[in-house]
Amino acid sequence: MTSDKNINLWIEGVQGSGKSTLLQELVTMNPHLKVCREGDYSPVELAWCAWMNKEQYEAVLARYEEISEEIKKYTVKEGDRFIIMYTRILTDIPGFHRDLEQYEIYNGRKKYEEIKNIVISRYKAFRDTGYVFECSFLQNLTEDLILFHEKNDEEILELYQELFAALDKET
């Protein structure tokens, strides 16, 4: 791979296929790349992250006051939303991860139109380059569309055409 900073790379694949190994090799060879692994903050993907409004965020900080600084450390504010990389927080507080899991957008937690709007708006807002994304385009969204929204191949392809158009900097 060249050291071109004007591209983004998307690594997809089934579990155990070597995605993380490939990602690490790419970053070793191209240290300028910004890495978005599953569970990290990503400008396009919300898997393994809690996505909440201000009231929900403040309630979580109050409920888990003893680790509120750690929560803040793993939070990114994006518009009027707060994104917590909660799976990165190591704690032995019973139920913490399960509690924050309810704020994820996947696994049937959002209606189809809502998840579609969230995902498309994030892709439209993303205009940066120099990223390498792990499991950020196909895996989590496709799984959600099939398992929880019962979308057929044509409906899934239509949404991905919209997402691809949103990423196209010429449109």
Give a label for each model feature.
Residues V14:
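P-loop (Walker A) phosphate-binding loop of NTP-binding proteins
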Residues S20:
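Walker A/P-loop
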Residues Q102, Y106, K110, E114-D128, ...:
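ATP-dependent NMP and nucleoside kinases share a basic, alpha-helical "lid"
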Residues V27-T87, D144-L145:
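Conserved substrate/cofactor phosphate-moiety recognition/catalytic segment
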Residues S17:
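ATP-binding Walker
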